[in-house]
Amino acid sequence: MPTIGVKRDLLFEALGKTYTDDEFQDLCFAFGLELDEVTTEKQMLTKEQGDVAAAANASEEIIYRIDIPANRYDLLCLEGLVTGLLVFQGKLKPPKFQFVELAKRQVLKIDPSTAQIRPYAVAAVLRNVTFTQASYNSFIDLQDKLHQNICRKRTLVAIGTHDLDTLQGPFSYEALAPDQIKFKPLNQTKEMTGSELMDFYSTHAQLKQYLPIIRESPVYPVIYDANRVVLSLPPIINGDHSKITLKTKNVFIECTATDRTKAKVVLDTIVCLFSEHCAQKFTVEPCDVVQPDGSVISYPELEVREERISVKRANAYIGIDEPAEKLADMLTRMYLEAKVDGDSLVVKIPPTRHDVIHACDIYEDVAIAYGYNNIKKSLPAFMQIAKQFPLNKLTEQLREQVAQAGFTEALTFTLCSRDDIGRKLNKNIDALPAVHIGNPKTLEFQVVRTTLLPGLLKTLVANRKMPLPLKLFEISDVVVADESTEVGARNERRVCAVNCNKTAGFEVVHGLLDRVMQLLSVPWKSASGTKGYYLQATEDPSYFPGRCANVMYDGVVIGKIGVLHPTVLQAFELTTPCSAVEFTIEPFV
């Protein structure tokens, strides 16, 4: 959930009323927001840097830090927040956004070469904008919040804003080799090629995290004007030539993307929120974007959608009984203009409310406007007896019984390193059905475990100073890649136990296997034709040769049991012999 910081005095001035902290907190709660903290810039810097001296010159102006729902992009800046609150209070009607047409539109042409890096682009113009220091800061902060939120740290969408008066259209969006691109980056004094720019910003506190998005690509995306002046190198940085200042009057906004829908949402959000600062409020100049196939699409769309909802169903879902007119008024206060049409409501969804994608989202806004605290508590109209999920119930029963058998339970991490389930167990990681993390933050958490064994062995290492024997177990899920499932992977509940002593003690884990099967009422298969479990000799690189067996049930391998291989013990820094058993319990549910 993103958090925005707004200066209290500016906020109250825009709202036209002064509130106490408690009163404003109540207003936020009624609107579905939360006042997270009342602080100052000085306190924030002191907290972040842990040094009072570093914040000595910081402002002591009161700042409200407000938690915003992750899908309410229209509330991520002061302008959007104020408009939303004023409409909610009935002090302002929802704005109507309009296009203004000049004799000639600005044009952005997408070159086919961009298909291999960031294939989509959208654009718009805000005319006759008046920036103050506060609105300028808000404009920059909104872009940052959008980049971190819907833009997914610029991987899906990158925003560029430029002083249009310093540029000459039409504009072109191309993809070129890094050394073919040369320009002066924002707030720098010398020109750099694409390759030099990557090296220069590799240690930059804010920008270094975005470099990997395009660094390894043979081409970098770049936007030029008619004079071949570089506007931006998305998603890294804008050019210094067209930077926005307080004197900027006409703003050219471009968004390049790997997701066209997200780009349209971002563009709509920016132009709707900051068209408030145009001389002619809530007006936007559209741009023509020429696609690689020659077709032309006009942006922004600023589409006002309509959704029809049932009054009866809205009341039933929320648990209230209000007339259609009252529900329409509630929705209008939530920035969704609604009109009564028989037993239904026709709801107009403005371009600022891209979070509304289903009738349920509208019902939620009705509930917020009505007030969750005002909904009367009531017992459900029907009775239903709940019961525990069978697999979880079996797990709880086995945990208790295995513990009573003398084993100590361990709860280990679901994520582990590639080496833990691969090299250390004498296995090829590429041959395992493992689910890999796309962007692991540490070497310890690279894949989802496919076996419980590494977690128990690492627990043994952490407790090797304890007296022997050490007998550990865990009953939990592993995750196995499976293309036949909808998400490409499935969970499997397993029990795993390890015995660590001066001797391997295979009979200890074998005895535990027998005890668990006894508890499950599964007999030992002593003759052909009878149903039960048995052991079948096998070889596994994780186990000592000749001392490993498959655990079989109804002719199917459900696990393994054996003495661990010395190289496995050495890889996990263990010096005492160990035996282990691991098998799935799902067939017994």
UniProtKB/Swiss-Prot annotation:
Organism for this UniProt entry: Drosophila melanogaster
The EC number(s) this enzyme carries: 6.1.1.20
Superkingdom of the organism of origin: Eukaryota
Chain residues that bind Mg(2+): D355, D361, E364, D365
Primary location group: cytoplasm
NCBIfam families: pheT_arch
Reactions that this protein is recorded to catalyse: tRNA(Phe) + L-phenylalanine + ATP = L-phenylalanyl-tRNA(Phe) + AMP + diphosphate + H(+)
SMART domains in the cross-refs: B3_4, B5
Keywords for this protein: Aminoacyl-tRNA synthetase, ATP-binding, Cytoplasm, Ligase, Magnesium, Metal-binding, Nucleotide-binding, Protein biosynthesis
UniProt key word Nucleotide-binding: yes
Quaternary structure, from the entry: Tetramer of two alpha and two beta subunits.
PROSITE patterns reported in the protein's UniProt record: B5
Designated name of the protein: Phenylalanine--tRNA ligase beta subunit
Cofactor: Mg(2+)
Gene Ontology, cellular component aspect: cytoplasm; phenylalanine-tRNA ligase complex
Places the protein is found: Cytoplasm
Pfam families: B3_4, B5, PhetRS_B1, tRNA_synthFbeta
Result, substituting A158W: Reduced survival rate after 50 days of age
Record CDD domains: PheRS_beta_core
Any GO MF annotation of the entry: phenylalanine-tRNA ligase activity
